[in-house]
């Protein structure tokens, strides 16, 4: 367990920083950079699990997720070349609740939700919202759905129209910009706005408890589909968390959203803040993020049966 390697300082650093604190101001920004080279100690502290949804052997995944009580620490810090965004567990729980509210209203109970988004905090909140409804996330391109024998999704969420599952009953487009307040431009007919249409929903959602054996995640790739149950995701997160035991923050730098979500769950299971990097982030930004947040990188683990990809 070592900090992300690299002694070199980046030549340029992000110029925009945002912090989502315990008061819900979803897009409060500041022009003051948090990247102060004079800081000698990281700001991120370990997460207290006291406010989390109580763990249950029947549905262990819910016990990992943040709640409205988790307001005193950042649970997620997002880094891209242009910005740094902090989200407390409280704010993440509100985004998840609003997302769950939209899914329940538009797609019904325990929906199958296709998520075709790049790694980022928005992709994470769509997964969290789906799991609050007791639903199942399908991640990957829409094309393998039929060939893989996977059920058609009730909803499809993407950042471009061509990535939407064409036969999904509900289609949602999410802007790529982290701080966007809505889709940029005209939406196709009957397609929902993944920010503007989410915001009116309530800040709280009573989680639907379901069995540990119920499928939580389906990975779509190469004409196949690999399922992971809610219990398997929770067990995998616990096993991965042991590789960074005692860390206050975990660096998550992976090329796809599915692995990013799994790594974030592992960080949270270990009581750490997840420091999530844009997939296109250069090495210099990764070094900056690791230094500023006191983050360590999780060692890769072999692919486990039924999980479909390494952590």
Question: What is each residue range found by the language model?
Answer:
Residues 138-191, 238-249, 280-310:
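Conserved ATP-dependent adenylate/AMP-binding module captured primarily in the ANL superfamily
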Residues 1-9, 56-58, 77-85, 91-95, ...:
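Long terminal accessory regions outside catalytic cores
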Residues 98-99, 129, 159:
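Active-site and donor-binding regions of nucleotide-sugar-utilizing enzymes
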């Amino acid at each position: 367990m070592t900090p992300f390697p690299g002694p070199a300082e980046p030549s340029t650093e992000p110029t925009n920083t945002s912090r989502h604190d315990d008061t819900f101001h979803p897009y409060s920004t500041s022009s003051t950079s948090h990247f102060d080279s004079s800081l000698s100690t990281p700001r991120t502290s370990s997460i207290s699990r006291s406010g989390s949804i109580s763990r249950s052997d029947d549905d262990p995944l819910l016990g990992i997720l943040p709640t409205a009580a988790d307001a005193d620490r950042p649970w997620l810090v997002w880094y891209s070349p242009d910005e740094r965004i902090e989200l407390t567990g409280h704010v993440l729980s509100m985004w998840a609740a609003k997302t769950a509210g939209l899914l329940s209203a538009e797609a019904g109970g325990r929906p199958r939700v296709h998520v075709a988004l790049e790694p980022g905090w928005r992709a994470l909140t769509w997964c969290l919202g789906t799991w609050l409804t007791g639903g199942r996330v399908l991640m990957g391109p829409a094309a393998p759905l039929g060939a893989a024998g996977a059920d058609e999704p009730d909803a499809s969420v993407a950042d471009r129209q061509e990535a939407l599952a064409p036969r999904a009953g509900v289609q949602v487009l999410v802007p790529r910009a982290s701080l966007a307040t809505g889709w940029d431009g005209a939406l196709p007919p009957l397609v929902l706005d993944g920010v503007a249409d989410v915001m009116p929903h309530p800040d709280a959602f009573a989680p639907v408890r379901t069995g540990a054996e119920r499928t939580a995640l389906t990975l779509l790739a190469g004409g196949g589909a690999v399922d992971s149950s809610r219990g398997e995701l929770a067990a995998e997160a616990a096993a991965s968390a042991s590789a960074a035991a005692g860390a206050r923050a975990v660096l998550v730098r992976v090329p796809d959203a599915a692995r990013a979500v799994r790594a974030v769950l592992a960080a949270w299971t270990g009581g750490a803040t997840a420091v999530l990097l844009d997939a296109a982030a250069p090495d210099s930004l990764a070094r900056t993020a690791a230094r500023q947040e006191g983050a360590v990188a999780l060692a890769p683990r072999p692919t486990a049966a039924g999980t479909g990809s390494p952590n």
